[in-house]
């Protein structure tokens, strides 16, 4: 539900800004997202990475979150393509639900807005 809500928030922003051609590529986990983006980097102008990591009782949360973020940043800089980071890192499920709520401040939508901003889709909105 959390990932689906992040996707919904992102898709809503894309459609609102008349982006009609986009693909949704699913990943088995957060750690695999940079690899999946790297395999598809030449096929798209930009990417929006979405997902959720909820902290457990081991340091695994920290390693996975950092690895995914570092991988995404490396791909962004190395390929000169924007990748919006909508991977939310939360302390519990309630926090994750709040940050992915489509009726509130959905982090998937925010990641989509960031990518569109970098691509220049908001030029007219700033006047």
Which sequence ranges carry the predicted segments?
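Glycine-rich phosphate/diphosphate-binding loop of Rossmann-like nucleotide-binding domains
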Residues: 1-28
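Phosphate-binding/catalytic loops
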Residues: 91-106
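Glycine-rich phosphate-binding loop
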Residues: 35-72
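Short, acidic/small-residue loops that bind anionic groups at enzyme active sites
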Residues: 62-89
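N-terminal beta-loop-helix "entrance" segment that forms/cooperates
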Residues: 23-39
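A charged, well-structured terminal subsegment
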Residues: 105-127
């Amino acid at each position: 539900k959390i990932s689906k809500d992040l996707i919904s928030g992102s898709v809503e922003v894309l459609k609102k800004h008349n982006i009609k051609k986009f693909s949704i590529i699913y990943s088995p986990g957060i750690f695999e997202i940079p690899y999946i983006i790297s395999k598809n980097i030449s096929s798209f102008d930009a990417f929006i990475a979405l997902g959720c990591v909820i902290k457990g009782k081991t340091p695994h949360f920290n390693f996975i979150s950092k690895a995914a973020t570092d991988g995404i940043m490396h791909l962004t800089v190395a390929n000169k393509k924007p990748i919006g980071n909508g991977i939310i890192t939360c302390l519990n499920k309630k926090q994750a639900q709040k940050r992915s709520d489509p009726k509130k401040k959905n982090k998937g939508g925010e990641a989509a807005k960031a990518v569109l901003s970098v691509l220049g889709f908001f030029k007219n909105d700033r006047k």
